A protein has these predicted regions:
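A penicillin-recognizing enzyme superfamily signal
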Residues: 1-66, 75-76, 81-88, 99, ...
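C-terminal substrate/ligand-recognition segments
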Residues: 55-72, 99, 105, 109, ...
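Active-site SXXK
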Residues: 69-70, 92-120, 126, 157, ...
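Hydrophobic "anchor" residues
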Residues: 71-72, 238, 407
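Extended, hydrophobic alpha-helical segments in both membrane/secreted and soluble proteins
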Residues: 72-73, 80, 85, 95-108, ...
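Conserved catalytic neighborhood of penicillin-recognizing serine enzymes
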Residues: 112-176, 222, 234-259, 263
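Mid-domain, small-residue-enriched loop/turn segments at the edges of structured enzyme/sensor domains
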Residues: 132-140, 172-211, 220, 224-225
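Low-complexity, Gly/Ser/Thr/Pro-rich intrinsically disordered linker/tail segments
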Residues: 370-440
Length: 440
């Protein structure tokens, strides 16, 4: 309640009278609220009750952009403008695993390929904690709380969003180099030089993240976002012309290899973007890729949908970071943000008026890009756990898809080792304390 304008007004009217402030905060009066069925509604309730009601809504922001021009084709700032004026497209939130794009892009810059391997294993390091102002031990974990111990191609690690591999790559490539690459691709927000940046610990906004992914979709060429292309006065005289400049932010070879990584999110076994096939599977004349992202405590859920001529990004989260889902069953990017992008892409690609957005990334143009750099055996674990908590599609079983998105086989919970089933049950128990809304 202390964050609301009415509290400051009451504080000025009743200085040193906390009982009076509490009385008026709990006194019923006419309040405007939001309802999904009716939109804006009026009710006679107290300010405290209105906060308890409104704060529970999950919010959404969405952007669609053309990679070749930077033209913003869709911009949705929130679920209802009358109730929430703040534009969530510009909100600063942790990008989670969507930031791994820059880690892997820099890895490709430095000569690695999607078929190079790294091991998914325990890693620990000493880092400086700014809040505690001391050196602490940081042990990043995977979303499912375990490590396979296996060596896997980078294309599999990216598709499955393996945190341990991303952190290790961050140390190998250098965080400063990753920051430089992210800035060249379109990230303008300040990024902290810390190992956790590889997992998306620094805040960014939706617009710049979408713009950066467009750089990869556009073969490494970066365009600034364009909202207005041209303005004329009443006499038809041009008074403004939108920017049409572009620059090669990352080499073509790097962009091509990262495109393969993004498509692998839908094609690799256990890829966290596989459920996008349910929305765009009918449009085989177009290449699709994606990357999910989820921040700590499921406070932010992201999905980046990528095609050669259209890039979309959705964010879902609470008004405050303390408002979030308790588990990954609903809180992951694949569960909340991916369907938003999926329905939008489906509506675009089924419309004959938008045939210009169909197309494939194409074969490599450079002779030094060989097939063995990006076409290699996928990683198949010996036994698979429920990937609901790893930004994956989840469900009763795990669907394994081939390179064209067709099911190969299904691994059911019965295929899990008994010890792993027990671990899953333990992980599924919520341990988070319930939120006290009165403290807002």
């Amino acid at each position: 309640a202390r964050k609301q304008p009415v509290y400051n007004w009451l504080l000025e009217k009743f200085p040193n009278q906390p009982d009076s402030i509490t009385y008026y905060l709990n006194k019923s009066h006419k309040v405007k609220l939001f309802d999904y069925a009716k939109g804006s509604i009026e009710m006679n309730i107290s300010t405290m009750d209105s906060i308890r009601y409104m704060v529970r809504f999950m919010h959404c922001a969405f952007v669609a952009m053309e990679p070749q021009t930077g033209a913003v084709k869709a911009w949705v700032g929130d679920i209802n403008f009358d109730s929430w004026k703040y534009d969530k497209v510009k909100a600063m939130r942790q990008p989670g695993s969507t930031f791994k794009l820059f880690v892997y892009t820099e890895a490709m810059n430095q000569g690695l390929t999607p078929c190079d391997k790294r091991r998914d294993e325990y890693i620990t390091m000493q880092v400086y904690d700014k809040k505690k102002q001391e050196v602490v031990t940081w042990t990043p974990s995977n979303a499912n709380g375990s490590f396979s111990g296996d060596s896997m191609p980078l294309k599999s690690a990216f598709a499955k969003s393996i945190n341990s591999v991303a952190v290790r790559l961050g140390q190998e490539m250098g965080i400063k180099r990753i920051i430089e690459t992210a800035e060249k691709m379109g990230i303008k927000s300040p990024l902290e030089d810390a190992p956790s940046l590889a997992l998306g610990s620094s805040d960014v906004n939706l617009l710049e993240l979408t713009n950066a992914y467009c750089t990869i979709a556009n073969d490494g060429m970066h365009h600034e976002p364009v909202l207005v292309t041209r303005i004329e006065d009443k006499d038809g005289k041009e008074v403004f012309l939108g920017p049409a400049t572009s620059e090669q932010a990352v080499p073509y070879k790097t962009a091509f290899l990262v495109q393969q990584l993004l498509m692998g999110g839908m094609r690799e076994p256990g890829g966290t973007s596989q459920s996008l096939w349910g929305y765009v599977g009918d449009y085989r004349d177009t290449d699709f890729g994606g990357k999910t992202g989820t921040s700590n405590n499921h406070s932010d859920a992201w999905f980046m949908g990528v095609s050669p001529k259209l890039v979309v990004d959705a964010w879902v989260g609470g008004e405050y970071r303390s408002i979030h889902f308790r588990t990954g069953a609903l809180g992951q990017g694949s569960r909340t943000a991916l369907p938003i992008c999926g329905y939008f892409l489906q509506s675009v690609f089924r419309d004959p008026a938008f045939k210009q957005y169909h197309g494939k990334f194409g074969k490599p143009r450079d002779a030094d890009i060989t097939r063995d750099m990006y076409l290699c055996d996928s990683y198949y674990p010996r036994a698979k756990k429920d990937t609901t908590e790893t930004d994956s599609t989840g469900g009763e079983g795990i669907i394994i898809l081939d390179g064209n998105g067709n099911p190969i086989r299904e691994i059911s919970p019965g295929d899990l080792l008994p010890s792993e089933q027990g671990q899953e049950k333990k992980r599924s128990r919520p341990t988070e304390q319930p939120l006290n809304l009165d403290e807002l």
